[in-house]
């Protein structure tokens, strides 16, 4: 039941965001939740890239090593130029929004809030985390969020403890990270969104351009063979053609309004055995003591030699 609570809350927040701002919300991680059991394909590609075709830089910061049963921060950085806007589904300009996915190794999960430091609480204010599914608590999602205030998203992570979970071993683990800014170009159904450049399907001459009541444009194109083709352009992209223009097949009819994109990367973290750390510290102490004793012994020998006149 406890695991269901975050999912139910996430669904509630998502539903409210769809009602309040449908244009900005439908391009985000819940599409992957609805259509894929695992957000990472066998090739290593995170499925968000199937809808967000533009590639953008995403960065991540995690500690080199962590101790068992400890809380650490995984920081996803989604850089872009401040005040960048995107087009909504009705064609209007809206602030760019961001989202992120962090795929942790088995056993790692979102840290309970009672273990968050004051610093983490401050850094995650206004951020709501959901797990990918009830069974995959090691896969965490965030978004959509206002981009200008969330170019860095902090994930508070709790490391597992091999002492209490026999399936966990000390060693190096991979973490897969994805970061997105802006809406996608393709819906899971395969349809194009209005966040695309639209091209002519065939060569011909533009014979008419009519505007619809919802901001869309209906372009009539007459081919050399006399066939008339209708191209419907949704609201948002700016037209690059006018009546009587001749176009080739594949020529752009509109600008490309997309200002976002998706990026992914892999990083690593070592689940460190504290016994090894204690052993290493003991080794350093022993070496330091040996060096000190060696210096003292050398000075003692020098004093004896000086007293004997050697």
UniProtKB/Swiss-Prot annotation:
Q: Which PROSITE patterns match?
A: CYTF (PS51010)
Cofactor requirement: heme
Keyword Protein biosynthesis in annotation: no
GO biological process terms, alphabetically, are: photosynthesis
Superkingdom of this protein's organism: Bacteria
Residues that, per the record, bind heme: 28, 48, 51-52
Q: How does it sit in the membrane?
A: Single-pass membrane protein
Please state the span of the N-terminal signal peptide per the UniProt entry.
Answer: 1-23
Q: Does the keyword Disulfide bond apply?
A: no
Note on how the cofactor is bound:
Binds 1 heme group covalently.
Q: Which family does it belong to?
A: Belongs to the cytochrome f family.
**Described function:** Component of the cytochrome b6-f complex, which mediates electron transfer between photosystem II (PSII) and photosystem I (PSI), cyclic electron flow around PSI, and state transitions.
Protein name as it appears in the record:
Cytochrome f
Q: Which organism is it from?
A: Prochlorococcus marinus (strain MIT 9313)
Name the gene: petA
């Amino acid at each position: 039941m406890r695991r269901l609570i975050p999912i139910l809350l996430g669904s509630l927040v998502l539903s409210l965001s769809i009602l309040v701002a449908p244009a900005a919300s439908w391009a985000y991680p819940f599409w992957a939740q609805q259509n894929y059991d695992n957000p990472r394909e066998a090739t290593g590609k995170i499925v968000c890239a199937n809808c967000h075709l533009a590639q953008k830089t995403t960065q991540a910061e995690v500690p080199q090593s962590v101790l068992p049963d400890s809380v650490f921060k995984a920081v996803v950085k989604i850089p872009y130029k401040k005040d960048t806007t995107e087009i909504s589904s009705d064609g209007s300009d809206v602030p760019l929004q961001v989202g992120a996915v962090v795929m942790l190794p088995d056993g790692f999960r979102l840290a309970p809030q009672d273990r968050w430091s004051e610093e983490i609480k401050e850094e995650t204010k206004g951020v709501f985390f959901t797990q990918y599914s009830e069974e995959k608590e090691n896969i965490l999602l965030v978004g959509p969020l206002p981009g200008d205030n969330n170019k860095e998203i902090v994930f508070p992570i709790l490391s597992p403890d091999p002492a209490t979970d026999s399936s966990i071993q000390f060693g190096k683990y991979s973490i897969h990270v994805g970061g997105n800014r802006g809406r996608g170009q393709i819906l899971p159904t395969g349809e194009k969104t209005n966040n695309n450049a639209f091209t002519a399907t065939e060569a011909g001459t533009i014979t008419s351009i009519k505007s619809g009541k919802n901001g869309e444009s209906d372009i009539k194109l007459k081919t050399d063979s006399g066939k008339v083709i209708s191209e419907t352009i949704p609201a948002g992209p700016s037209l690059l053609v006018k009546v009587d223009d001749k176009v080739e097949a594949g020529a752009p009819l509109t600008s490309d309004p997309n200002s976002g994109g998706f990026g992914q990367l892999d990083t690593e973290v070592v689940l460190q055995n504290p016994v090894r750390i204690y052993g290493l510290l003991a080794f350093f102490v022993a070496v330091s003591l040996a060096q000190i004793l060696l210096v003292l012994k050398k000075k003692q020998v020098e004093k004896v030699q000086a007293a004997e006149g050697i």
